Amino acid sequence: MQNKIQVKSVEKRENALIFCAENSEIEVKGLSARNHVLVDSDNLSFLYILENESSFIYVSIPHTCWEAMHEAMNNDVVMFVRVNDIEMELEGLKEEVEYLVENIEGNANYGEELVTAVEKVFL
């Protein structure tokens, strides 16, 4: 079973950036970071993967949160997702997004809209 946690906003704290997700039916306890990010070109989002014993859960980080994420990446700020009042560190998010940005730059395979959005924020 695949599920998605949708980030709606960001909250800045000293030395931390919190991606605030909508309340979810997903049981967050027992999930662990997979240190892997995918791209959702259709929804202009990065998908951070969490997992448990039986499934993957995607944390969808929309383009509306990218500027705050980019700033956090530049300042080596730790990034978390908060779901149902539980915070989880998104380990390796910076490195994964940096890798994706390199691959997305000028690459029409991701779709013009995504390429433009990524280049505008990250380059």
Curated annotation (Swiss-Prot):
Protein name: UPF0738 protein BALH_1059
Family: Belongs to the UPF0738 family.
Domain of life: Bacteria
InterPro entries associated with the record: UPF0738
Pfam families cross-referenced by the UniProt entry: UPF0738 (PF19785)
